Amino acid sequence: MPAAIRALIAGNWKMNGLKAQLAEFEAMLAGAPALADKADLLVCPPATLLHAFGQKLGNGARSFAVGAQDCHANVSGAHTGDLSAEMLVDAGASAIIVGHSERRADHGETDSVVRAKAEAAWRAGAVAIVCVGETQAERDAGQTLDVVGRQLAGSLPDGATAENTVVAYEPVWAIGTGLTPTANDVEQVHKFIRDCLTKRFGGEGAAVRILYGGSVKPSNAKELMAVPEVNGALVGGASLKAADFLAIAAGCP
């Protein structure tokens, strides 16, 4: 991981967490100061907990933030059940995940939809965490780089910078399966992503953080975080427990 790019460990709680889980978040906050020289920390709880988590953060200066897992592209309107980026930021989010593979698969989100959501996050003043990644079938067909390149081109709006954008590479076949690609495979894809970002966005693209996601856990975090062009992790299930989440952050160089 280049020393110039500070690591980000982002936790995606997905559809998990009730008020009782505030204790886990408080434990994360308690352990965060010891990791201040390692990484920035971000937790994206379900929207029902976003405000409560934000209140726990308070106004103190620390490298810890809360974010959201998705947003609607519009500011407001007749979109029953949806939440705009502005609403999420108002509730305390400073970053919003867009284009997660589960949204792409379960809700049919296309690259153009993801792009609009990324623009919405920027509009509201939030960082867009744009997810890309191939399925098992695409991997087996040798299409990984083609798929990732196409998703990057279609999902990232013009104007991406290191301040408003994070890219997360999540091979779909590795999410929640316990399977992880080899370090060499991760390096190949992350270097490809970096090349795409630099060619399109120049110096800003060279500084955008690229996270790895897909069965990241304490036992493999150190190896993954040592891979060139891996600037942190997007963590799923392991982010639900403070001990695991903090241990993953401790694996950053």
Curated annotation (Swiss-Prot):
Catalysed reactions listed for this entry: D-glyceraldehyde 3-phosphate = dihydroxyacetone phosphate
Catalytic activity, EC: 5.3.1.1
Sample GO molecular function, one term: triose-phosphate isomerase activity
Active-site feature positions: H100, E170
UniProt KW keywords: Cytoplasm, Gluconeogenesis, Glycolysis, Isomerase
Top-rank lineage group of the source organism: Bacteria
Single GO biological process annotation from the record: glycerol catabolic process
GO cellular component: cytosol
KW Iron (keyword) present: no
Cysteine pairings via disulfide bonds: none
Pathway annotation: Carbohydrate biosynthesis; gluconeogenesis; Carbohydrate degradation; glycolysis; D-glyceraldehyde 3-phosphate from glycerone phosphate: step 1/1
Compartments in which it is found: Cytoplasm
InterPro entries: Aldolase_TIM, TIM_sf, TrioseP_Isoase_bac/euk, Triosephosphate_isomerase, Triosephosphate_isomerase_AS
Annotated substrate binding sites: N12, W13, K14, G176, S215, G236, G237
One Pfam family it belongs to: TIM
Keyword check for Cytoplasm: yes
Membership in a protein family: Belongs to the triosephosphate isomerase family.
Subunit structure: Homodimer.
PANTHER family: TRIOSEPHOSPHATE ISOMERASE
Its job: Involved in the gluconeogenesis. Catalyzes stereospecifically the conversion of dihydroxyacetone phosphate (DHAP) to D-glyceraldehyde-3-phosphate (G3P).
Protein name in UniProt: Triosephosphate isomerase
Protein encoded by which gene: tpiA
